């Protein structure tokens, strides 16, 4: 399996915690992966859409990032990101999401690590890739 991790690095400590969990889960699942970074969560869906149209597509995608700040702003960023990620998933992409919504960066970091949100996102992606392969819907040919 070849997986693309798209991470928003707006909060570097949170991103590192999410990435640690995701890479550990992908390594445990014996998946190959590449990692690309974008500035914030709103860019994650666009990056995945671009990658899905590339000449060498991936079997699945993992979206990692965090949203903090005043509730009304953070909730809007989170909702719009999730809406776009859900649309990508509904189009048939195997996509695991690990987007953390919290009041501040410290709380986001704690959530990311204690709940292994990055690992959960990677495991969700892998399970969807496996489902697609079982049903004959693999995104790419396996080597």
Predicted regions and their residues:
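Glycine-rich phosphate/diphosphate-binding loop of Rossmann-like nucleotide-binding domains
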Residues: 1-35
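Short, ordered loop/turn segments at secondary-structure junctions
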Residues: 9-10, 38, 66-67, 99-105
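Active-site rim loops that border cofactor/substrate pockets in soluble metabolic enzymes
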Residues: 28-55
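Glycine-rich phosphate-binding loop
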Residues: 47-85
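Phosphate/ribose-phosphate-bearing ligand recognition and processing surfaces
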Residues: 71-74, 78, 105-114, 126, ...
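Short, acidic/small-residue loops that bind anionic groups at enzyme active sites
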Residues: 76-102
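A charged, well-structured terminal subsegment
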Residues: 115-143
């Amino acid at each position: 399996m070849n997986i693309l991790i798209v991470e928003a690095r707006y909060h570097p400590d949170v991103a590192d915690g999410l990435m640690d969990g995701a890479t550990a889960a992908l390594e445990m699942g014996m998946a190959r992966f590449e990692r690309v970074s974008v500035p914030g969560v709103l860019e994650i869906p666009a990056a995945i859409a671009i990658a899905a149209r590339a000449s060498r597509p991936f079997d699945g995608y993992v979206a990692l990032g965090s949203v903090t700040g005043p509730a009304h702003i953070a909730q809007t960023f989170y909702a719009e990101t999730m809406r776009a990620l859900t649309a990508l998933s509904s189009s048939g992409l195997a996509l695991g999401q690990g987007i953390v919504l919290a009041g501040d960066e410290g709380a986001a970091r704690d959530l990311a690590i204690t709940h292994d949100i990055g690992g959960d996102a990677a495991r969700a992606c892998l399970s969807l890739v496996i489902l697609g392969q079982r049903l004959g819907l693999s995104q790419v040919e396996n080597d």
